Every structure is written in structure tokens, then in C-alpha cells.
Amino acid sequence: MISFSSFYQQIADSNLQHWLEELPAILGQWQREHKHGNLPKWEKVLNKLHYPAPDRIDFTTRVEVGSGDQLSKGQQEKLKNLLKLFCPWRKGPFDLHGIHIDTEWRSDWKWERVQPHISPLKNRTVLDVGCGSGYHMWRMLGDGAKRVVGIDPSPLFLCQFEAVKRLAGNDHPVHLLPLGIEQLPPLDAFDTVFSMGVLYHRRSPIDHLLQLRDQLRTGGELVLETLVVDGDENTVLVPGERYGKMNNVWFLPSAKALEAWLKKADFVDVRCVDIDVTSLAEQRSTEWMPNESLVDYLDPNDVSLTVEGYPAPKRATFIAVKNQPNKDLV
């Protein structure tokens, strides 16, 4: 069974220690709820990942663990077959002992858009909300973060992350907790909080912004990336049953409306640093994610629209700072 004991040990003498009052019980409940289904099968695969310590690691320009020269052809093929059991791989790419995991998303492109605008991560404690399989967490570590905690409730994402971590070495201060942000006790401790690709999935986006704020220390930085539409500060798209075939998209604000939401949630120094239309090269089907992808979600006659007729995905990145506590916001 996947253990979180090393995480508890690492935060025992840190500014995250108050989580120890509640998180062990919360994660214990998660483990009990997932003792059936796919998780035990994936854990058996994880237990087969016994490979030599990597001869090289690069988290600064990519996520690379081990060179292609370290394993025999047979060992590489066995490793590839094991990693294939964790398909679909959505966020990446990863290079593991010479095996290139070409994921659905080019998450490295998103990082290249976001990273130049954020405060340096050196020695910072970072929370990544909706972290997926953890690609950006490794890049944050590569940029010098002291500790990175990611949260995402998906058991598959947890196992994909654990596969990379076991190959890289378990001593890295990066941890994925299979939880949603609503399950986290407020901490007011993180230097930087990322929420990328999450806000439009929330029924109450303002509550999500307040939950993000509650994890930040005063003066800490929020990095928020989400879908937006064109329009003024009063423009918000509320899709019907589906948006891009997704049935869990609730609100798509304009960039100006999102700026107003952030200020309403008591963030200051709010600025939009990037707006980018998602390209068919950035999100697509691959060997490692052979299911439908962006091209299938767009109008075949007009890629500026989704199949439902809404504007095609456009993503904005905002940077904001947590203000002094406001007792009127609860």
C-alpha cells in the first residue's frame, strides 16, 4: 500500500506541521475507500519498479530520470510495459531510463509560459492544486523549491507520480496527496500556491479562490491558470450541459472578470501575465494517451469553436498576492 509516512516525517518540524492534526485520518479514510477497484492492481505494478539509482536526473529543463544507457534493451522493454499499465498518461512529458512518455498534454509548454512571470521558487514551500501526475511539481523542485506538495484526488495520477518518484529516488522533497483542496485544513503557510486548470471545474469559483488564499501565508503568491473568454468585467460564460465534451465545466470568465474575482477574494497586485489559445499540438492523442483529445472536442469545420459552438479553449495566467487577513471574508 502507498504510504504517506515519509511525508508526515518531513513536515513534523516544518511550518506544515499543523496538518498532522487532521491529515493522517483523512488520508487513512481515502486508503480505506480505495482498497478495492484499480488501486491495488496499480500498487502491484509499483512494487515491480526495482531499478538501479539513476545515473542522471534533470528537473530543470525537463523531467528526465536515468539515461538510455543504464538499462539493457530487455530491462527497458520491461519497464516500458510496466509504465504502459498506468495509461492514459495526460500530463508530461517524462523521460525515464530512455523511455519517452509522450503524454496528451505538453505540460512543458505551459511551464515555459508561466515560469518567467513567477517569483523565484528557490527555498520556497509550494502547493500545487490539481497537480495531475506531478509533472509541474518536478519542474518546481528543479527551480529550487524547498518542498513541493501536490494534491489531486485521482488514484491513477497518484500511481503515475509514485512511479516517477520511485525511479528517481524517494528522498526528493516532493509529495502528492490524493485529496481535493476542500479537504485540506487551512494552513496559511505556503509561499506559492499554484492552481492550473482547476477553476473552471469548480461549482463555486470564488470559494475556490478563498480556499487557495487560506493555504498561502500573508504576502504569498498565487499562480492561477484557467480557461477564459473574451469580454469585459461583466462577461462570464456558463456553458450548457457540456463544454468541449466535458460535463464538469461551470464558469468561464473573461480575463477582466477574473481579475475582479481575485480582488473580491482579497488578493492584491493582481495581473494577467499570459493569454494563450490551446493549440492542437499542445493537447493531442499519443501512444500513451490513445483516447479522444482536443481535435475531437472542436468543431471540425471551425476550430475556433467547440463542438457545442462555444469559443475554443483559451487560457489565461494570473499572478496575485495574498493581502492581510480580511475578517469580512469567511
Curated annotation (Swiss-Prot):
The protein's superkingdom reads: Bacteria
Cited Pfam families: Methyltransf_9 (PF08003)
Q: What is its EC number?
A: 2.5.1.-
Q: Which SUPFAM superfamilies match?
A: S-adenosyl-L-methionine-dependent methyltransferases
Cystine connections = none
Task: Check the record and name the Gene3D superfamilies matching this protein.
Answer: Vaccinia Virus protein VP39
Q: At which positions is carboxy-S-adenosyl-L-methionine bound?
A: K91, W105, K110, G130, D152, P153, S154, I181, E182, M196, Y200, R315
Top enzyme category: transferase
Q: What reaction gets catalysed by this protein?
A: carboxy-S-adenosyl-L-methionine + 5-hydroxyuridine(34) in tRNA = 5-carboxymethoxyuridine(34) in tRNA + S-adenosyl-L-homocysteine + H(+)
Signal peptide residues on this chain, from the entry's feature table:
none
Molecular function, one GO term: transferase activity, transferring alkyl or aryl (other than methyl) groups
Carries keyword Transferase? yes
Name the InterPro entries on file. CmoB (IPR010017), Mo5U34_MeTrfas-like (IPR027555), SAM-dependent_MTases_sf (IPR029063)
Mind listing the GO biological process terms from this record? tRNA wobble uridine modification
Keywords per UniProt: Transferase, tRNA processing
Does the UniProt entry include the keyword Transmembrane helix? no
Record function comment: Catalyzes carboxymethyl transfer from carboxy-S-adenosyl-L-methionine (Cx-SAM) to 5-hydroxyuridine (ho5U) to form 5-carboxymethoxyuridine (cmo5U) at position 34 in tRNAs.
Record text on subunit structure and interactions: Homotetramer.
User: What family is reported?
Assistant: Belongs to the class I-like SAM-binding methyltransferase superfamily. CmoB family.
Which PANTHER family has this protein been placed in?
METHYLTRANSFERASE, TRNA U34 CARBOXYMETHYLTRANSFERASE
Q: Mind telling me what this protein is named? A: tRNA U34 carboxymethyltransferase
- Which source organism? Shewanella loihica (strain ATCC BAA-1088 / PV-4)
The root-end lineage is: Bacteria, Pseudomonadati, Pseudomonadota, Gammaproteobacteria, Alteromonadales
Q: Which gene encodes it?
A: cmoB
